[in-house]
Amino acid sequence: MITDPIADMLARIKNAQAARKSEVYIPHSKIKEKIAQILKKEGYIEDYTISEENKKGNQGTLIIKIKYLDNRNTKPAISGLRRVSKPGLRKYVGADEIPYVRKGLGIAILSTNKGILTDAEARKEKVGGEVLCYVW
């Protein structure tokens, strides 16, 4: 059993990029789907789909198409991923304490009472929450 599914998702994306894969298969959950939606909207991945094939129990598969900046799959769009809030040590921030990732060149993904948001959206909505991860 995976104790931290979000860290597992980020590690799978990082490993797929290192191996120059075009897509990665991740067990589906609603929070992972929202994170994939944000990554697509921000331009870090090409696309994502949910497959009901190879279904284990009630869980489908989230298929993420990795985005590369060149034709040879050598320069991934995501140069770094970091899990911030972990099951053993949660990291919460207020609306005025939301961090800037790489001086504004990256994004922070937060879990707020208004759903999963990027740092810019959370600042605009003036809500704080749990910092899930940084992407740059």
Swiss-Prot record:
It comes from the Bacteria. Keywords: Ribonucleoprotein, Ribosomal protein, RNA-binding, rRNA-binding. One of its GO terms (molecular function) is rRNA binding. One of its GO terms (cellular component) is ribonucleoprotein complex. InterPro entries: Ribosomal_uS8, Ribosomal_uS8_CS, Ribosomal_uS8_sf. One of its GO terms (biological process) is translation. PANTHER family: 40S RIBOSOMAL PROTEIN S15A (PTHR11758). One of the primary rRNA binding proteins, it binds directly to 16S rRNA central domain where it helps coordinate assembly of the platform of the 30S subunit. Belongs to the universal ribosomal protein uS8 family. Part of the 30S ribosomal subunit. Contacts proteins S5 and S12. HAMAP family: Ribosomal_uS8_B. This is Small ribosomal subunit protein uS8. It comes from Persephonella marina (strain DSM 14350 / EX-H1).
